[in-house]
């Protein structure tokens, strides 16, 4: 009986124009629902999986309203920046901090392309997993930043409780508990690696990663495992390794319940459920779920033969 009603509102009955939220072609609606409500809907047995026509219209309206809010606040921010650009009195900073906003420009957008603004927002939410907080603090240590001294940026304040504040990436829904961690994440989207090694061509997303990399050149390994004799160039490297001793697996797959030691391994696991094939070989017109599979393919005889055919 439940399967004939809408998953979102729970009231309207599904019809021919209702959408199956868990079809691959409709996954953008799950993303939009998460963007608006913060909820991650999961396909469950005996639970509706369709969204009714009314909720589709409500969702479009909510997305349009969100876009309008962002556009308007960007305009006010521009006016505020222009009016305060010539003011050198630092005592006025308290007024600016009363309404902080931050928006990221990702460069010129192609015509016809869906433009989706990205901004940082602080919201009230249940306390984050202690392990996630620990990982965020570890990243701060790697960056050499005191958590209490993180420089303030212009951010939309929705909550005044520091412990409840998180940063949300509006491109992918990722949550971060510290500003440096969020900034590092956004550099991934922009393709920025501003921290370059002086000894080689490697570039990194954060100063902490650069510092850890530099230890590869110096041979320094200051972070010793508390359970064995292994040593590591970074705090995070040691933390991840020690989970093999403690069997701590804080990253849980919402689809099947499997647990993993790092977010990276969980992300790789998720492609099994989503069926995404983001790594493509244009020469052979084939797509793969993992980068490693694509690399293996490029070494295959079939790929090499296709490369020769294309050159001839």
Curated annotation (Swiss-Prot):
GO terms under biological process:
instar larval development; positive regulation of ecdysteroid biosynthetic process; positive regulation of transcription by RNA polymerase II; regulation of DNA-templated transcription
Its predominant location is nucleus
Q: Which residues bind Zn(2+)?
A: 6, 9, 52, 55
Query: Which residue spans adopt a coiled-coil conformation according to this UniProt entry?
Result: none
Zn finger intervals (C2H2-type): 167-189, 195-217, 223-245, 251-273, 279-303
The entry summarizes the disruption phenotype as follows: Larval developmental arrest due to ecdysteroid deficiency.
Q: Which Gene3D superfamilies match?
A: Classic Zinc Finger (3.30.160.60)
Domain named ZAD is located at: 4-79
Subcellular localization: Nucleus
InterPro entries given in the database record: Znf_AD, Znf_C2H2_sf, Znf_C2H2_type
Tissue expression, per UniProt?
A: Expressed predominantly in the prothoracic gland during embryonic and larval development.
Q: Per its UniProt record, what SUPFAM superfamilies does this chain match?
A: beta-beta-alpha zinc fingers, Glucocorticoid receptor-like (DNA-binding domain)
What domain of life? Answer: Eukaryota
Q: Which UniProt keywords apply?
A: Activator, DNA-binding, Metal-binding, Nucleus, Repeat, Transcription, Transcription regulation, Zinc, Zinc-finger
Q: Name one GO molecular function term.
A: zinc ion binding
A GO cellular component term found in this entry reads: nucleus
Ribonucleoprotein among keywords? no
* Role of this protein: Transcription factor required for ecdysteroid production in the prothoracic gland by activating transcription of the ecdysteroid biosynthesis gene spok. Binds to the 5'-AGCTTTATTATTTAG-3' DNA sequence in the spok enhancer region.
Q: What else is known?
A: The name 'ouija board' derives from the instrument used for calling ghosts and is based on the fact that mutants cannot induce expression of the ecdysteroid biosynthesis protein spookier.
Q: What name has this protein been given in UniProt?
A: Transcription factor Ouib
Origin species, per record, is Drosophila melanogaster
The organism's taxonomy opens as:
Eukaryota, Metazoa, Ecdysozoa, Arthropoda, Hexapoda
Q: Identify the gene encoding this protein.
A: Ouib
């Amino acid at each position: 009986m439940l399967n004939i009603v809408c998953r979102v509102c729970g009231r309207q009955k599904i019809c021919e124009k209702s959408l199956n939220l868990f079809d691959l072609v409709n996954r953008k609606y799950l993303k939009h629902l998460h963007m608006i409500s913060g909820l991650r809907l999961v396909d469950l047995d005996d639970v509706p999986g369709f969204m009714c026509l009314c909720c589709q219209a409500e969702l479009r309206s909510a997305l349009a309203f969100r876009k309008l809010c962002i556009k308007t606040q960007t305009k006010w921010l521009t006016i505020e920046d222009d009016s305060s650009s010539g003011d050198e009195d630092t005592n006025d900073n308290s007024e600016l901090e009363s309404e902080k906003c931050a928006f990221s420009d990702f460069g010129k957008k192609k015509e016809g392309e869906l433009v989706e603004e990205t901004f940082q927002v602080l919201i009230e939410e249940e306390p984050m997993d202690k392990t996630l907080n620990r990982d965020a603090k570890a990243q701060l240590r790697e960056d050499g930043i005191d958590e209490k001294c993180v420089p303030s940026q212009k951010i939309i304040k929705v909550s005044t409780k520091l412990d409840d504040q998180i940063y949300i990436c509006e491109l992918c829904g990722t949550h971060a508990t510290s500003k440096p961690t969020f900034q590092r994440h956004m550099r991934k989207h922009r393709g920025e690696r501003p921290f370059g090694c002086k000894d080689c061509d490697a570039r990194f997303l954060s100063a902490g990663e650069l510092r850890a990399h530099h230890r590869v050149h110096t041979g320094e390994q200051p972070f010793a495992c508390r359970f064995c004799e292994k040593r590591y160039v970074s705090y995070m490297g040691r933390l991840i390794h020690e989970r093999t001793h403690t069997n701590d697996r804080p990253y849980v797959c919402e689809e099947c319940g499997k647990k993993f030691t790092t977010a990276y391994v969980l992300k790789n696991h998720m492609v099994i459920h989503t069926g995404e094939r983001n790594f493509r070989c244009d020469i052979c017109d084939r797509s793969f779920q993992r980068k490693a599979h694509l690399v293996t393919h490029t070494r295959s005889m079939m790929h090499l033969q296709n490369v020769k055919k294309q050159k001839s």
